[in-house]
Amino acid sequence: MSFANMFNKLSGQPESYEKKSLYRFGRTLGAGTYGIVREADCSSGKVAVKIILKRNVRGNERMVYDELDLLQKLNHPHIVHFVDWFESKDKFYIVTQLATGGELFDRICEYGKFTEKDASQTIRQVLDAVNYLHQRNIVHRDLKPENLLYLTRDLDSQLVLADFGIAKMLDNPAEVLTSMAGSFGYAAPEVMLKQGHGKAVDIWSLGVITYTLLCGYSPFRSENLTDLIEECRSGRVVFHERYWKDVSKDAKDFILSLLQVDPAQRPTSEEALKHPWLKGESASDRDLLPEIRAYIARSRLKRGIEIIKLANRIEALKMQEEDEEDIPSAVDVQASEASDKSGLSPFPALSTENSNTHPASTGNGESGGTKKRSLSKIARGAIFREVVLAKVREMKENEEREKVEREARERAHS
């Protein structure tokens, strides 16, 4: 037995903890309800390491083991690859393939151009991954743009599906799941209504993603859960003429088929893959976001991304109280504002898999309390600054939009 193994055993560390020495941890890539994701170097190159605090999943450890079990069974070009896992006394470490190309919507904002044909090819990649999961009776339950990542910065990079934290493997194809799961704006009506759900929830989420890809905004825009439920239950999906006049009929038909209120009326993943729109024959090559629409779409997407980044930053500040070794300083977190994302969902807002919140610091004595209060001030200051900056940006964007619209009207009348 090596000295390191002996020390780990004496300090109460699990046997697998010795694997941690194989990784050199770097920047923080994301933060969420249960932990953070950090970049790390190992002998085979760069990887992503999801670090989950055990105290945050106490009583729900099964959720972590289910994720590990799932990841080890998956092998698909459009699903992030599992590498390894290990644990310490107080954390789980899940090592996966590192996606450095950024989120799907980051790419749209960056290039400012996205054709219907691009959207068709993108959705086909995602649906291929979903179909692979559904054939194995696995429901992802948290499909959203933030969990769709490009592997590299190359223009022809593969898109991969990430974050299987609340995915479930069904005992049989007809099994009904009853726990709340998903993210606000993407969860299916049957999830929000607690009516029981299955594979069809992924199809609904994909419908929301497809709609958003084609116009830059969501088909359901309510800001609270009650109104969102009513909006989704109505079954009314509007294709506003101003933004949808150049989008093919096949694209709209595809979206409507996925956004059926009755889950039994939605196509299966296999059926959806056969839809004419995914063949790309009817999809247009014309840029979907020209002039005013491009500006509006980009500004909306950027605001959404900024909200996610703010949430990540705040969560990382909270996590600072938990562990100094694995969690970087607030300065490090802010410095990674423009960094690549990984598969840790920042907003599993509807999930009831684990009702625990981040516990307060357990530091003893006056100094511990002082540190806790100091971090709270940092968090409050960060929130205030970001809200003010977001408001200023929004005012400027509104002014610019009004200017562009005014000039467009003047050109139309000239």
UniProtKB/Swiss-Prot annotation:
Signal peptide per UniProt: none
Region spans: Autoinhibitory domain: 278-314
Chain ranges of the Protein kinase domain: 23-278
Binding-site list for ATP: 29-37, 50
Record region (Calmodulin-binding): 293-315
PROSITE patterns: PROTEIN_KINASE_ATP, PROTEIN_KINASE_DOM, PROTEIN_KINASE_ST
Documented EC number(s): 2.7.11.17
Pfam families with a match to the protein in the record: Pkinase
Function text: Calcium/calmodulin-dependent protein kinase. Required in nuclear division cycle for progression from G2 to mitosis. Required for hyphal growth.
Domain notes from UniProt: The autoinhibitory domain overlaps with the calmodulin binding region and interacts in the inactive folded state with the catalytic domain as a pseudosubstrate.
Subunit relationships: Monomer.
The protein's name: Calcium/calmodulin-dependent protein kinase cmkA
